[in-house]
Amino acid sequence: MAGNEKSRAKMEQAKGKAKEAAGRAVGNERMTAEGRAAQSKGDARQAKEKGKDVFRH
């Protein structure tokens, strides 16, 4: 289960980076902000999973 959540976090981070880059390329501030938000969500999920791992081992 934890592996699934970790891969989900990485996927959110990657999608966020891509969306942010696309937003910058076309000059769309909203898309850029949404990309940053997705990256932050992925970062938070990854931090949560790392915290869980600390208590498991």
Swiss-Prot record:
It holds the Pfam family CsbD. InterPro entries: CsbD (IPR008462), YjbJ_sf (IPR036629). Residues 1-57 are annotated as: Disordered. Residues 1-22, 42-57 have a biased composition (Basic and acidic residues). Belongs to the UPF0337 (CsbD) family. This is UPF0337 protein SCO0678.
